[in-house]
Amino acid sequence: MNEQAVAKSDPTASSQPAIIDCKGLGKTYVSGKLEVHALRDVDLQVMRNEFVAIMGPSGSGKSTLMNLLGCLDTPSFGSYRLNQTESANLEDDELAAVRNQEIGFVFQTFNLLARATALHNVELPLIYAGVSSRKRHERAMNALERVNLGHRWDHRPNELSGGERQRVAVARALVN
């Protein structure tokens, strides 16, 4: 991550450990004889209730960092602890559980199911987590209300504005 900035909010002082703790994190890709250092020596701590923005020019390693933080990829070197657990020590099924229960993504293209309502799109992570239908409906509606879309729960993505689709994606990321 060359020439990249990490903008962080100023959370209230807390004695709790960081929920994200990276030390010397790096990722190298090898393609034939070419070695690409996509991420070099990143140190980052994120505390509970803290908001963080990862910014930088194209090719600076933002997506690589997000893939590592989201447990979609593994670092080539360094340490990444999520909730005090070293990610490198997790098995595939444990990583899948982390992605389903602890990490929410808002993708650039939102990745909403076109034929599903806003409510069903928000319910998806809860379905995968095995949450009962009643609780799933309640939690998804609550998440939609938190992003001011409770009144649009029965609309499909093509019936929503770009900003509304983005808020559905945010609700889906927050529902777990």
Regions found by a protein language model. Give the residues of each.
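Pre-NBD coupling/linker segments of ABC/ABC-like ATPases
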Residues: M1-Q16
